[in-house]
Amino acid sequence: MIKFALALTLCLAGASLSLAQHNPQWWGNRNTIVHLFEWKWSDIAEECETFLAPRGFAGVQVSPVNENIISAGRPWWERYQPISYKLTTRSGNEEEFADMVRRCNDVGIRIYVDVLLNHMSGDFDGVAVGTAGTEAEPSKKSFPGVPYSAQDFHPSCEITDWNDRFQVQQCELVGLKDLNQHSDYVRSKLIEFLDHLIELGVAGFRVDAAKHMAAEDLEYIYGSLSNLNIEHGFPHNARPFIFQEVIDHGHETVSREEYNGLGAVTEFRFSEEIGNAFRGNNALKWLQSWGTDWGFLSSEQALTFVDNHDNQRDMGSVLNYKSPRQYKMATAFHLAYPYGISRVMSSFAFDDHDTPPPQDAQENIISPEFDDDGACVNGWICEHRWRQIYAMVGFKNAVRDTQLSEWWDNGDNQISFCRGNKGFLAVNNNQYDLSQELNTCLPAGEYCDVISGSLIDGACTGKSVTVNEHGYGYIHIGSDDFDGVLALHVNAKV
C-alpha cells in the first residue's frame, strides 16, 4: 500500500508539472504571442514598451540567445548552430538580454526563448569561431566553451529513413552534431543553461527539434528546471511554459502525442490547412468545425500559427507576407476563432531560403525603422504592426472566455460568426460581394470595423456598422475591397 501511495503521489506530481508547463503565464486578459524573428534585444525592449504592451500583446518569442557559429553571408539559420551557451549573439549580449527581459516583464510582456537542446553546430572546416569569440572544432565534436567532447554526442549517422525512430532521434539532423540527452552530464549542462535564462526572468521556451529527442529525456530535463523567478512578477511555484517543435503530418513514427503531455506542441497541420483554405483550395464553410475535428491537438495543447520562420520559406500551401490579402484574412480568422495558443509572425523580407536579416556593411543586424503609419520600411516586414493584425490581437483580448455562436456561411467562401455577445467576424473569399444582414450578437449601437480603420477619439477612421436592437447589422465586404474581412467588438463601439 505504501509503494502504491508513493507511485500515485509521483504520478500526480508529474501530471501537475505537465499541466503547469502548458500555462503561458500571461498577464490579465492578454493572449497572443509574437515572434520577433532576429530582432536585437534592445529593439525588442523598446517594442515591448512602446507598441506591444499598448496594443495588448501577451508575449514575445525571441531568436536563440546562445553563442552560434559564424557562417558566410550570415544566413538566419546560423542562429540554430550553437557553439556554446554564452549569451552573446548578433541580437546582443547577456546584459542587453537581461535588460530586455526585465523591461518587457515590467510592462506585462512575457519572453519565450527559442532553445536548442538537440544539437550543436554542424561540420566546419578547421576551427570555427562563434559570436562570442569562442573556438570549437565541430568536425571533432569539440566544443570547449561548454565544454562538450565526442563522448557527449551520439555516434555520427545520417537520417535516411524518417520512419526509423533510431535515426530520427539519434542521427544528425542536417549534419548537426547530435547531443546525447540521456547522459547525466549533457542533461546537467542543458538544465544549467535553461535555469540561467529562468533566473534572468524568461517565462518559457520554444524547444527546437523536439521530435529528434526522446520524450523521456525531455521529461527529465523539464522536470528538473527551476520555478519561474518571482522577482519578475511570476507567482510562487510557477513553471516555465514549454512549447515544442514537433512536425507531425500524421502517421509519423515519432508523433506529437509523445510530447503533448510535457507541454504545448506546434500544430503544423493548423498552418497547412489554414493556408489551403484561404488560398481557395478548401471552402471556408468547412471551417465551422475548425480544431480537433480536423485532427488537430486539443486547444490547450496546440501552439497555433499561420506561418513560422521555417515554413514561410517553403513552397506550398503555407501563407506568408507575400500574399498579404489572404494572409490578413487567415490571421484574422486565426485570432477570432476560439482554438489554440496563438502566435503571430514578424518577419524580415527574403528572396531565398538563406536571406539574412537586415544588416549593415559590417554584418551587424540593423534596427527596424518605421514610416508615419508605424509600418517597418528598411527590410523588416513587421506583420505584427499591420493594423489588420494588431487590431485582431485587441479583438482576441476583447472576446476572451466567450464561445463561438451564430455561424453563417453562403455554402462556399463567405462566413461569419460571433464570439458570445462581445465580437463578430465576417470574411469574404469569393469573387463577388458579401452584402447581407447578419447577426452580430452585439448590443445595439454603432461599431468601428477594426480591420479597415481604428477608433480614435470616439470616431472611426474606417467602415462602421450599425447594429439594431436584435443584434443584426448590414455587412458589406466587396470582392475588390482592400481587405476581405470585417471585425467588430465591444471595445470598438463608437
Curated annotation (Swiss-Prot):
Site-annotated residues for Transition state stabilizer: 310
Cleavable signal peptide: 1-20
Cellular component GO terms, alphabetical: extracellular region
Keyword Cell cycle recorded: no
Molecular function GO terms recorded: alpha-amylase activity; metal ion binding
Coiled coil: none
Cofactor note: Binds 1 Ca(2+) ion per subunit.
Swiss-Prot/TrEMBL cofactor(s): Ca(2+); chloride
Annotated disulfide bonds: 48-104, 157-171, 376-382, 418-441, 448-460
Catalytic residues as annotated in Swiss-Prot or TrEMBL: 208 (nucleophile), 245 (proton donor)
Enzyme class: hydrolase
Localization annotation: Secreted
Residues that coordinate or bind chloride: 206, 308, 343
Enzyme Commission number(s) from the entry: 3.2.1.1
Residues holding Ca(2+): 118, 169, 178, 212
Family annotation (Gene3D superfamilies): Glycosidases, Golgi alpha-mannosidase II
Catalysed reactions listed for this entry: Endohydrolysis of (1->4)-alpha-D-glucosidic linkages in polysaccharides containing three or more (1->4)-alpha-linked D-glucose units
Pyrrolidone carboxylic acid PTM positions: 21
Alphabetized UniProt keyword annotations: Calcium, Carbohydrate metabolism, Chloride, Disulfide bond, Glycosidase, Hydrolase, Metal-binding, Pyrrolidone carboxylic acid, Secreted, Signal
Alphabetized InterPro entries for the sequence: A-amylase/branching_C, A-amylase_C, Alpha_amylase, Glyco_hydro_13_cat_dom, Glyco_hydro_b, Glycoside_hydrolase_SF
GO biological process, one term: carbohydrate metabolic process
Protein family according to the UniProt entry: Belongs to the glycosyl hydrolase 13 family.
Subunit structure: Monomer.
Protein name: Alpha-amylase-related protein
Organism in which the protein naturally occurs: Drosophila kikkawai
